[in-house]
Amino acid sequence: MKKKLIVFHPAIAPYRVDFFNSIDEIFDAKFYFEFDNALEQTFDQKRLQEYLSFIPKYLSPGFLGIKNLRFDVLSILWKNKADVVFISEYNLLGLLVCLFKILVNWRLKIVTVCDDNVKMAQNASWVKRIMRYVMLHILSAVILADPKSMEWYGTSLKYKAKYCYFPIIQSDAIFRERLKQASSFICIFNKEV
């Protein structure tokens, strides 16, 4: 029987599709997104969703306009009885998941995915440092996309959480097809210029 997993993530982005699909294949997974598109970039969501092996769900807007304060996370966790929860970075949503673990299900495994490089980790704002400090005492693991960050975390932040390096992945076959499409577009673009 597959373990139950809930993923809370900001948005669907092209570089996360294969990662999410891999998770969906291995776990009995449910995916909840905070936004219908990435805040810093705009992607063709309709097209991206064609590549997903799951149906995405979306969280209600942040409480009092605070983007990461989404109390429906607590009811989702209560109803779904997950074994593992994936969150993104260190934020209020992640703190709510940690609070749920402390108050309701101490055996819940919480894993965060962090894209910080070493400079970002070292120069984090005091708010992020406090959240990171609190959460690293509760999290089961931190997945870091940069090997140097993992090394820095291991030597500078010795807390309960385990650190592991896992690069942003894409299926090789899909990547090669997209590269081929992009190359033909570049050729067409260069001829027009």
Kindly give the residue locations of the regions a language model identified.
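Histidine-centered beta-alpha loop that forms part of the nucleotide-sugar donor binding/catalytic region
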Residues: 10, 89-90, 112-118, 167-169
